[in-house]
Amino acid sequence: MKVWLLLGLLLVHEALEDVTGQHLPKNKRPKEPGENRIKPTNKKVKPKIPKIKDRDSADSTPKTQSIMMQVLDKGRFQKPAATLSLLAGQSVELRCKGSRIGWSYPAYLDTFKDSRISVKQNERYGQLTLVNSTSADTGEFSCWGQLCSGYICRKDETKTGSTYIFFTEKGELFVPSPSYFDVVYLNPDRQAVVPCRVTVLSAKVTLHREFPAKEIPANGTDIVYDMKRGFVYLQPHSEHQGVVYCRAEAGGRSQISVKYQLLYVAVPSGPPSTTILASSNKVKSGDDVSVLCTVLGEPDVEVEFTWIFPGQKDERPVTIQDTWRLIHRGLGHTTRLSQSVITVEDFETIDAGYYICTAQNLQGQTTVATTVEFS
């Protein structure tokens, strides 16, 4: 038994010597205990970075949804293009999806309360219909959804629709004007528009000065042409004033518009520049007195006057007269002179005190006062 045990130990010993005597391959080294045995590779792998959608940026700007459709023959519908060209006499039906729809269309149709246009609100859409169209109806038609809380509504900017329609009429290249001569005021602090709009989309339109006779180029810097508005003076100044007209050419025909008198405004926009002056600040009993309130402003800006005077509570009879006229202040500068005068006859003690005038326009109001004493 011992012999077999010794023989087995001898064989194991020889086997271990054979293993330890083997040579390692070139460029190989023995693995350390616990070393990663995964075969290394030279392949480069580009890490993938997951794309994260920026929800805040996407949600901050709501998408605008066009809600307008044009009704065609036989009940067909289509989304109207930004501009449409139709023949005068054709009917137009536009629909906008929504239970509360607001509409805007050329002011010409509203000014004369034209029965050719009708606006209706149905359960699911608003409807605008225009029949027997004319070239004067050329303009923008737009709609929008309304967000209402009770009787108070506001425009939903995300649900709108619009189209500009040219109504082409034989012999009419320009949208008709109610007069043969219009005035355009040139304000130094805002754009001015010569409103010669055409009824044919493809018409070539140029601007001309009457004297000295020459074409005024729309160079895109001082003057640009907008088919929806006309010729736009971006930065008006006094050199632009004078008489101008437009010329349109289309289909081998040409036409001249009405004439426009361009007047430069010397007074910039703002609340009324107001002064007050009494005919006398000391008045004897039984005499008459007048107090004058004067405003110099833009030619096309109306001014409203209101008065507060000492005898008002006692219903003292007075006379108030408002007038205005255009005046030229040299170098072609034109301003509007607006005046209001309050007259008190047979002056009494209750008429003594402060006479207060308030002048108001679209930009604001100005209040001035003066005193009239009893002497």
From Swiss-Prot:
Keyword Secreted in record: yes
Gene3D superfamilies: Immunoglobulins
Superkingdom field: Eukaryota
UniProt-listed SMART domains: IG, IGc2
This protein's GO CC annotations: extracellular region
Cellular location(s): Secreted
Signal peptide: 1-21
Glycosylation sites per record: N132, N219
Domain Ig-like C2-type: 62-159, 272-375
First-listed, main subcellular location of the protein, grouped into a coarse class: secreted
Classification via Pfam families: Ig_3 (PF13927), VEGFR-1-like_Ig-like (PF21339)
Keywords from the UniProt entry: Disulfide bond, Glycoprotein, Immunoglobulin domain, Repeat, Secreted, Signal
Region (Disordered): 22-64
SS bond partners: C96-C143, C293-C357
Biased composition (Basic residues): 40-50
Oligomeric form and interacting partners: Forms a complex composed of PDGFRL, TNK2 and GRB2.
Name of protein: Platelet-derived growth factor receptor-like protein
Source species: Macaca fascicularis (Crab-eating macaque)
Gene that this polypeptide is encoded by: PDGFRL
